[in-house]
């Protein structure tokens, strides 16, 4: 039996058990497909992104000493607690989490007022996130950072320092015209900011927002930059 944790709350708090491991749905690549009359085959243009995937769990519920209806209401409140995406973790891939939104309402089967069963489905972003990737790595001198996955990752980079500086990550060069203590560059959101202040006007990107390729990525900086996280 397995465990799921959604929006920071564990299924164990509701006496829920996942009956078996979920299936693994691979993400679909996002293509623009065009057909030219008189020409054999379609033209596929890779947009460089993937579509969402579904992740479903068959769960069994034990009401214990609680009334079944009360327990069912608790579970519904839990699954609908997030507005949009929230962290989804499970005991089958403990080193990863996903960003997921609960998408399926349904009927919880009532078994003699003492137990229940339902399939819950989440609409997930296509990527999995390594939990270790949420731990900041501080770079104070030229270094190499390893991406252990087989896919490019989109980092959140905190640049510390003052004044003007240049940051290189692999083939990506970032010029910052004015750093005031720190500045954050978010490759997922494609945004630069400091707290709630937009700083896109301070940043020049030679090759778009940086990505960490599979394997080692060299990081170096100059000017007023003192460290990078």
Question: What spans do the regions from the language model cover?
Answer:
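A short, compositionally biased
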Residues: 1-2, 79-85, 159-164
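Short polybasic amphipathic segments
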Residues: 2-7, 86-88, 165-168, 191-194
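Short, acidic/charged, Gly/Pro-enriched secondary-structure junctions
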Residues: 5, 60-103
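Short beta-strand and beta-hairpin "edge-sheet" elements
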Residues: 26, 87-128
